[in-house]
């Protein structure tokens, strides 16, 4: 079997964590299941999926902001709760700032691409409103995999509480707005205190979606 560079990185992190924390250790790109209602903050740390399953000590988990201050969450609330247009909601202004700063917004480099992206988000809202079930990455890609690459990104703080990690913003915001009980997510950073606890991740590893 030939592994990709990403797979090898995941396996190395899994092995390191297992040596340090035992069989219950966090795993890279691990699929967890969280209640969107339990997530009330987002990390100030710049989001990076390369941190997935990484165990980190220190006070990074205290450097958070209220979730409703996240720009993408805020404009999704304006769009889907208050019924505003994307422009009124602030999505266009946010995209313009990203284009000016980085040359792209969510990987889109033109206004035509951004417009199509916003249409896709509208469709996702309609779909999730009807099904009330967010697919795992494996379900979406029709693959047999226990990893949750590209999922809603969730860090775990020292007390085992979820922190939004800044990836999968629109999916996560819509699920929270619709009050969907449980969704799949990709494990991000895990505080060392939580990694040392057998209970911290155990309850997040069971798929309780209906």
Task: List each model region and its residues.
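Charge-dense, extended regions
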Residues: 203-210
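Short alpha-helix boundary/capping and kink motifs at helix termini
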Residues: 26, 88, 94-164
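Membrane-proximal basic amphipathic "stem/tether" segments
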Residues: 1-46
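Intrinsic-disorder-associated interaction segments
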Residues: 4, 8, 66, 88, ...
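A short, basic-hydrophobic beta/loop patch
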Residues: 11-26, 47-65, 72, 148-202
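A basic- and aromatic-enriched beta-loop-alpha substructure that forms the phosphate/nucleotide-
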Residues: 44-108
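Short amphipathic alpha-helical segments that mediate assembly, nucleic-acid/protein binding
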Residues: 8, 16, 73, 91-92, ...
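Short, flexible helical or helix-coil boundary motifs
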Residues: 15-18, 22, 26, 84, ...
